[in-house]
Amino acid sequence: MCDDDVAALVVDNGSGMVKAGFAGDDAPRAVFPSIVGRPRHQGVMVGMGQKDSYVGDEAQSKRGILTLKYPIEHGIVTNWDDMEKIWHHTFYNELRVAPEEHPVLLTEAPLNPKANREKMTQIMFETFNSPAMYVAIQAVLSLYASGRTTGIVFDSGDGVSHTVPIYEGYALPHAIIRLDLAGRDLTDYLMKILTERGYSFTTTAEREIVRDIKEKLCYVALDFEEEMQTAASSSSLEKSYELPDGQVITIGNERFRCSETLLQPSFIGMESAGIHETCYNSIMKCDVDIRKDLYANTVLSGASTMFPGIADRMQKEIVALAPPTMKIKIIAPPERKYSVWIGGSILASLSTFQQMWISKQEYDESGPSIVHRKCF
């Protein structure tokens, strides 16, 4: 079906970042924010080449005059026109390829609505004229990237988190748990608690500054209560951050209060279990015979698992929940920020995968619903 000399494109559309590149590469060529920005004000200078919309890094750099929108919320595409702009930007500006010449592997969150993947399929074939495409589940790709076929993946990006138990390469759908708590919620919470310190961040542009503070300074405490006492009694945990205008702000216990939300969602008023308990619940929904393998292969993936200290804390919390003699191993690969993309790159370059592509011909015969038969 697919010529060997044409590299497949791998596009991991996250809620926060798009990771795109060529199958067989060990890292994505293009990583840019999943943002479409539109001007807030009317352009007055003629000949400036002002556009009616900006995508990715360009939108990010002009954020002061734009209204920024993320077309993917909680892993689900909510604005298809903007999404099309992002794909167009990915193919033509970032990768500089003609999409009608390359098969495309796209990724999606587990438990996504069926209509969502149908629409993705339709746009690839009808708007971009792809010769072939495939939609893979993000967490499964992360497990591939870690070199395993069995394990439980905790995947947490910007918009959505999941625990996905996988046995011998098959995701176990009845045990997948989806948690609509991820990086974007942590950023919003950090904005809120910084306001309590007297720093005001409100606009979509300022939210990006807070996201940067989160990525550079936040960490997960091994013992939250103890860390709170340390922060209250000394300034050893305080760090300073310079804002774009030169003003310097200091943050203390916010550094770990922000990420603690992953373990205590009640911080932002959510009634769900924390990520440690969610992993445990997910394992408990699986057959008793395979639980041992899942406990010993708990793989973290996604950018919201990049907080220092998260693996040790998960280990401690899951050990407390699991049976006393159980061996528990949390795997946190250093490249986990991109492990979904890396898994996609591995999958799309396997010789055994080549018959799995949905071809243009199959699409023309069956329509968008073909995606449910060929991608599982």
Curated annotation (Swiss-Prot):
Which molecular function terms from Gene Ontology are attached? Answer: ATP binding; hydrolase activity
Q: Which SUPFAM superfamilies match?
A: Actin-like ATPase domain (SSF53067)
What EC number(s) does this enzyme carry? 3.6.4.-
Keywords assigned by UniProt?
Acetylation, ATP-binding, Cytoplasm, Cytoskeleton, Hydrolase, Nucleotide-binding
Residue numbers carrying N-acetylaspartate? 3
Question: Where is the protein found, in the record's own terms?
Answer: Cytoplasm; Cytoplasm, Cytoskeleton
Q: An example Gene Ontology cellular component term from the record? A: cytoplasm
Broad EC category:
hydrolase
Please describe the organ and tissue distribution of this protein's expression: Confined to aboral ectoderm cells.
Q: In terms of one coarse class, where is the protein primarily found?
A: cytoplasm
Q: Which reaction does it catalyse?
A: ATP + H2O = ADP + phosphate + H(+)
Q: Which residues form the propeptide?
A: 1-2
Q: Which InterPro entries match?
A: Actin, Actin/actin-like_CS, Actin_CS, ATPase_NBD
Protein purpose: Actins are highly conserved proteins that are involved in various types of cell motility and are ubiquitously expressed in all eukaryotic cells.
Q: What family does this belong to?
A: Belongs to the actin family.
Q: What is the protein name stated in its UniProt record?
A: Actin, cytoskeletal 3B
Q: Which organism is it from?
A: Strongylocentrotus purpuratus
